[in-house]
UniProtKB/Swiss-Prot annotation:
GO cellular component term, pick one: proton-transporting ATP synthase complex
Organism the protein comes from: Picea abies
Compartment list: Plastid, Chloroplast thylakoid membrane
Lineage: Eukaryota, Viridiplantae, Streptophyta, Embryophyta, Tracheophyta
Keywords: ATP synthesis, CF(1), Chloroplast, Hydrogen ion transport, Ion transport, Membrane, Plastid, Thylakoid, Transport
Disulfide bond positions: none
UniProt cross-references to HAMAP family, sorted A to Z: ATP_synth_epsil_bac
Assembly, per entry: F-type ATPases have 2 components, CF(1) - the catalytic core - and CF(0) - the membrane proton channel. CF(1) has five subunits: alpha(3), beta(3), gamma(1), delta(1), epsilon(1). CF(0) has three main subunits: a, b and c.
Protein name: ATP synthase epsilon chain, chloroplastic
Length: 137
């Protein structure tokens, strides 16, 4: 049995195919979804989603949103998302370094919150790359 997974952002379809299993980061923790999962609507946190296809895992950095699970169909509506294969490691490392520095020099509560969210997004992109298996040539 499989699940139909669709990941949508406001401007594009990021993923639309059959999968065996997903592990999703929600605001109340991670949940694993297999076929015949109970119906559910959940807030999606900034975090990594793991996707299992025929014995291989893929990852995706999700930047918050909502997920609906119903009758083996999973629809994830996100602010933005990137597949592990689309993330440039050097650029992600540089973004993380800049976000960390911005948080260290943030002045005031608003700047600190914005810098913390930027750091969480940057960390998620790095985690999506490191959580995916190496690509063999």
């Amino acid at each position: 049995m499989t699940l139909n997974l669709r990941v949508l952002s406001p401007n594009r379809v990021i993923w639309d195919s059959e999968v065996k299993e997903i592990i999703l980061s929600t605001n109340s923790g991670q949940i694993g979804v297999l076929p015949n999962h109970a119906s559910l609507v959940a807030a999606v946190d900034i975090g990594v989603m793991k996707i299992r296809l025929n014995g291989q895992w893929s990852t995706m950095a999700l930047m918050g949103g909502f997920a609906k699970i119903d009758n083996d169909r999973i629809t994830v509506l996100v602010n933005n998302a990137e597949r592990d294969v689309d993330i440039d490691l050097k650029e992600a490392q540089e973004t993380f370094k800049v976000a960390k520095a911005d948080l260290a020099r943030a002045e005031g509560k608003r700047q600190a919150i914005e810098a913390d969210v930027a750091l969480k997004r940057a960390r998620t992109r790095l985690e999506a790359i490191s959580a995916s298996p190496p690509v063999s040539n």
